[in-house]
Amino acid sequence: YDSSNPVKPKIINDFSKIEPYSFPHSYSELPNGNILTTFQTKKGLKTVGGIVELDFKGEYLRASDAQPLDETIFMRPYGIVLIPEHNRIVTTNYDMHETDNGYHIQIWNMESLELLSTIKLPHVNGMINDQNPFEGRLLTDGKTVMFQTFSCGLFVLDGVETLNPNITKVFNFADKPFCSVPVRLKNYWIQTVASDSGGFNGLVVLDISNPYNPVETYRLNTGEDIGPHWLSPNVSGEKIVMTGFFKE
């Protein structure tokens, strides 16, 4: 889209796949003005996709496969976090077709698009919060990434600029509901939580001044008819738009 007039955006290109990659999901503008895209698959639901760099008109420039060396690892590139100060990209791992669950994230070299690491989330016995790393956000230090799983765990990734990146679980929003698209505003994390089985629906606000010890500061219950899914702030951060599902 040409969004120079956001009220009347114009389509300048469209695609459902860019051979051999298929099922694009997330888009993020690189420091050079190009667009980075995650493609979940290649030529079928059982294939692993990759990341693709496009120019501002959506034309293919280059790409890199997300297939780990260990081919038993389930990988479907999903969300994108750019870490320009350290030449890194982080992608999460959630299958929109729900053919299986992801338990790993990936770290890439931003300049070359080389896949550097595929890292498994730490598991907590008796819980499933390590399933399906969903959306990540870069923290204020410019190098630490916080991300949540669709299964409502919250994790911190540090050391992306080193040879030994590390993931730490720091919070659990709920046991069974779904945790979708969050917002980070300065040192606050605002998380959507939705349940289709009678659990909590609403927003949870955390003070993440210490990202390894988040403190819940507020919880908004949206009721059984509204399951929050997606959040986006305005430029000033004074207002947040929320979408959701359940009752029409």
Predicted feature descriptions by range:
Residues 1-248:
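Feature marking well-ordered beta-strand scaffolds used for ligand recognition
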